[in-house]
Regions:
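Hydrophobic core of transmembrane alpha-helices in multi-pass small-molecule transporters
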Residues: 26, 94, 105-121, 227, ...
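Extracytoplasmic gate region of multi-pass secondary transporters
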Residues: 35-39, 217-272
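Intracellular juxtamembrane helix-capping segments at the cytosolic ends
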Residues: 42, 120-134, 321-334
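C-terminal ends and interior cores of transmembrane alpha-helices
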Residues: 89-102, 291-303
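Cytoplasmic helix-loop-helix junction between adjacent transmembrane helices
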Residues: 112-147
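Helix-loop-helix hairpin linking two adjacent transmembrane segments in secondary transporters
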Residues: 145-192
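C-terminal transmembrane helical hairpin of 12-TM major facilitator-type secondary transporters
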Residues: 262-265, 271, 276-329
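A late C-terminal transmembrane helix in Major Facilitator Superfamily
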Residues: 333-370, 378
């Protein structure tokens, strides 16, 4: 890895990229999160089970996972200049036609396309681009950028809730498509490739990395951990609003709790990114994972409003901190030339985990009749993630000592 500390000033355009990717991922992640508010209206209208409806999130996640690898490779080889426009076309089209569908197969197909050709395109490839605009404080830059996902997951479900109430779920999807078109096109024009990434792409020799483990081993460890931490976090993302409305809380209150979760998620992503610059990416990842694993367990057991807001804030801060820490790990442990593929592979396992968590959360609800098992399952998967991260930490220390 290059000596980042020797460079004092980063290109100012890097902050334009931060704002642009923040916005695009806010819309993309917002749609993924808004499945939770469409879940009950769709289940009620078509008679689909919670598990079957939540599977829409799963197929979107799997689309993001598998195609994310392709887009990561394309980003490393050709750059990301036109990724915003490509994602705009598919995200807008999928939202528009979701308002027209009346079959669960069409529902799955449209969410798969949204994940594969929208969410996957503006996710890890653009994060890799942003990370290598910055040599001085890449963690902070990535934390702010990643905060867009949390912002979108709080704002878009709230907008969707109000649109559904006023216009119904069909028109809600179509109005969202118009809104996305107006916002995404201008920001897509601002996407440019990192100069560092451009140089790395044409360089004959590999750049120096000051890290004890090979890039392949780093990616393997991160990928193994990510799948379990994302299973943990996806259960509340998909099922928190149905959990609260099943407990006789209003839809407005449920959406407000989710909004608080995501507001603190914005804070968590930024602080986690900066913390990664200060104490290291992996210690930050472990710390945030512990908080996520503990806090997710409480949702089925707290039935008073203040407690739910406090718990949502704690979970939002730590789960979002995990997301930033993953990105900073990839940025600091792999080279610029491989960054797109590294983040895409991590994202692959992350989205597989998100999809599995969303599905099994619904399946366990269908079996048990409430969400107790679902959230216990989420916490158990978080514990597996912490174990893997601790072994990764020990492996780094051992190899660093051996090569000292």
């Amino acid at each position: 890895m290059s000596n980042d500390s020797s460079v004092v000033r980063d290109p100012l355009y890097g902050w334009v990229m931060v704002i642009s990717v923040f916005t695009l991922t806010a819309l993309s992640f917002g749609t993924m999160g808004s499945i939770s508010v469409f879940l009950k209206p769709l289940s009620n209208e078509f008679g689909w089970t919670r598990g079957n409806t939540a599977f829409g999130y799963t197929v979107a996640s799997l689309g993001s996972a598998f195609f994310g690898i392709i887009w990561g490779y394309m980003a490393d080889k050709y750059g990301t200049r036109f990724f915003g426009f490509f994602a705009t076309f598919f995200m807008v089209s999928c939202l528009f036609f979701l308002g027209k569908q009346n079959s669960i197969l069409h529902f799955y197909a449209l969410y798969f396309c949204f994940g594969a050709f929208g969410n996957a395109v503006v996710g890890s490839p653009l994060y890799a681009n942003v990370g290598f605009w910055f040599k001085k404080n890449p963690g902070l830059a990535l934390g702010i950028t990643a905060a867009g996902g949390a912002a979108g997951q709080g704002i878009i479900p709230l907008i969707s809730t109000n649109l559904i109430r006023v216009y119904g779920w069909q028109d809600a999807y179509m109005y969202l498509s118009f809104l996305y078109l107006l916002i995404m096109v201008p920001f897509s024009f601002l996407i440019k490739e990192s100069p560092w990434r451009k140089k790395a792409r044409i360089a004959v020799n590999d750049e120096f990395r000051d890290f004890p483990l090979s890039e392949r081993e780093v990616i393997t460890w991160i990928s193994c951990a990510v799948i379990f931490c994302c299973i943990c976090m996806s259960v509340p993302i998909v099922h928190l609003i149905p959990l609260l409305t099943d407990a006789s809380f209003s839809e407005d209150f449920a959406a407000s709790v989710f909004l608080v979760l995501m507001i603190f998620g914005i804070i968590g992503r930024i602080i986690s990114g900066k913390l990664g610059d200060m104490i290291g990416a992996l210690p930050t990842y472990i710390l945030m994972s512990i908080g996520q694993t503990i806090s997710v367990l409480g949702f089925p057991y707290i039935d008073f409003k203040v407690g739910l807001f406090v718990l949502a804030a704690a979970f939002g801060f730590t789960y979002s901190g995990v997301m930033s820490a993953i990105l900073v790990c990839a940025r600091m442990m792999v080279s610029a030339k491989l960054a797109g593929r590294a983040m895409a592979l991590g994202s692959f396992f992350g989205w597989v985990g998100m999809g599995l968590g969303g599905y099994f959360g619904g399946l366990l609800f269908d079996i048990k009749g409430d969400y107790t098992w679902s959230f216990q399952f989420a916490s158990a998967m978080g514990s597996v993630n912490i174990f893997i991260l601790w072994q990764f930490h020990k492996r780094i220390k051992k190899q660093a000592h051996a090569t000292a």
